[in-house]
A protein has these predicted regions:
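Extended, well-ordered alpha-helical scaffold segments
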Residues: 80, 134-150, 207-226, 295, ...
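Extended ligand-binding clefts on enzyme/binding-domain cores
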Residues: 116, 152-156, 160-163, 169-178, ...
Length: 487
């Protein structure tokens, strides 16, 4: 994707990232005394933008940063947490009012557009703090309202502009509108807003977001999911782009590979924004099931719309039954595993991609039980050389994907390994690897080379930064401070 001109926060992020290598060199020496520990901690200076340049500040988030930093004795880990956890708020959140209601537009980072997936994931770890901070709660309400608004502009789009300003992809051969940044159909784009709205409601008790705009969004989600089951033909969506990247366009005149209409939902593109090979993307279909059940609960409890709730539940049950029948492949080494993609004709794509939803991340999203034996087999498969996009080198190991290509590991995959781990030593390895592959910047990156972390993509990628903060916060709250302090 082409990147727009960097703004003030972008320049601050890039400058800070490059200026911290001296800090890293000063602070990597092993400390053996309290004095050395204090000196080492002092060497790590915050890489956050100056207070006046931060786009949004939250008292609850700042208090949480202070609390976690006080508990962590590893100065580099504390420094990285301080840099990463608030990165979405510091650099990507644009809060305002629209027609008397909160409205929040969230950049993905160095690309000044709002992805439904990224924005829903970027603000996710702040939801647990919303009850402590009315301003944070209002900002989150604005994200949810903006997501519903985006869905109602076009439920097939993955990324949106802040207004009808057009953009790089207006020449794509699809039903583009100036409000759209990109129109790649991805199931998870409609799931992340449901996940976020549901959790916000559960944490705050605020049901005001479930108004007519919400009901319209639900109708659009249901219609889109059903159209993409393709029971009545290929449906209204197609996509073509003039490009050198094969996975940035769809074959068969923009319709993608054929599918057998067995009840699963087509996802023309993956969460990486790469085209699917077989269009029933399994992790995203699992995500649709859990998201539809959440929507049904809201529609029943808040809107008193049993008709829509029943429609959500029936669709979820249909997709779930089809997953049980078509998603499992009997691997000669790992036994029954979940395929990454299928087509309903018997073809299976055996791989995983780092972007979430992924096969590895399914328990993180609440889509499968972590002790599901098929998931555990799948987890072993994806973290092995049997997965064509698993890379191992001198700097680390992990999952990447065709979006960046050979030998490039996504930190997101290492984070998901930690999120889905039940082994403290494995978690410890994950955190240490993440700390060792930041290239001295104090931030996460989109991907890094398996043999050289200094070779990385995207110095400003808010989702991965905030996700790292979410992981550390989760581990602290689960009583694993001692594990973190052993690093």
């Amino acid at each position: 994707m082409k990147k727009k001109t960097l703004g003030l926060c972008a320049l601050a992020m890039l400058s800070l990232a490059h200026n911290t290598r001296a800090n890293e060199m000063t602070a990597v020496r092993d400390n053996t005394t309290v004095t050395n520990h204090a000196l080492k901690a002092a060497a790590y200076k915050s890489n956050r933008p100056a207070l006046k340049n931060r786009l949004f500040t939250s008292k609850a988030v700042e208090a949480e940063i202070a609390r976690i930093k006080q508990l962590l004795t590893n100065p580099k880990l504390a420094w990285m947490f301080e840099n990463c956890f608030p990165n979405t708020l510091d650099t990507t959140v644009h809060f305002r009012m629209l027609n008397g209601k909160p409205d929040t537009f969230v950049y993905t980072g160095d690309i000044h557009a709002m992805w439904l997936r990224d924005s829903g994931a970027q603000v996710w770890p702040y939801v647990q703090l919303a009850h402590k901070d009315p301003e944070l709660k209002e900002m989150l309400e604005g994200v949810i309202r903006r997501q519903f608004l985006c869905i109602n502009i076009d439920p097939y789009a993955n990324a949106y502009n802040d207004g009808p300003v057009g953009g790089n992809w207006m020449s794509d051969k699809t039903d583009m509108k100036p409000e759209l940044h990109e129109r790649k159909w991805e199931i998870d784009s409609l799931c992340y807003p449901l996940r976020l709205a549901y959790q916000y409601w559960k944490e705050t008790g605020d049901a005001s977001i479930f108004d007519n705009e919400w009901l319209k969004a639900i109708a659009n989600i249901l219609q889109t999911f059903k159209e993409q089951q393709r029971k009545d033909g290929t449906g209204p969506y197609s996509f073509q782009r003039k490009t050198e990247r094969a996975l940035d366009t769809l074959n068969n005149d923009g319709l993608g590979a054929p599918v057998n209409p067995v009840g699963l939902i087509v996802s023309s593109f993956r969460p990486s924004d790469d085209a699917t090979t077989f269009q029933f993307l399994i992790p995203s279909n699992f995500f649709a099931v859990s998201s539809l059940h959440k929507a049904a609960e809201i529609l029943t409890a808040v809107n008193h719309r049993p008709d829509l709730a029943d429609e959500c539940t029936a669709l979820a049950n249909e997709v779930e039954a089809a997953l049980k029948k078509y998603a499992v492949y009997n691997h000669p080494e790992f036994g029954p595993i979940y395929a990454f993609e299928v087509d309903g004709f018997g073809n299976h794509m055996l791989m995983d991609d780092a972007n979430v939803p992924s096969l590895l991340a399914m328990p993180y999203l609440g889509d499968v039980d972590i002790n599901d034996p098929i998931y555990q087999n799948t987890r072993r498969f994806v973290w092995s050389t049997s997965n064509p996009y698993f890379f191992r080198g001198t700097a680390g190991e992990g999952i990447g994907g065709p979006h960046i290509g050979y030998d490039m590991i996504w930190p997101m995959s290492i984070m998901m390994k930690a999120f889905t781990s039940q082994d403290d030593e494995e978690i410890k390895w994950c955190i240490k690897t993440l700390m060792d592959t930041d290239a001295g910047t104090g931030f996460m990156h989109e991907s890094f080379h398996k043999d050289n972390p200094a070779k990385f993509t995207r110095p400003w990628f808010a989702w991965q930064n905030t996700l790292f903060g979410e992981l550390i916060l989760k581990l602290v709250n689960e009583g694993k401070v001692e594990l973190l302090n052993s690093l």
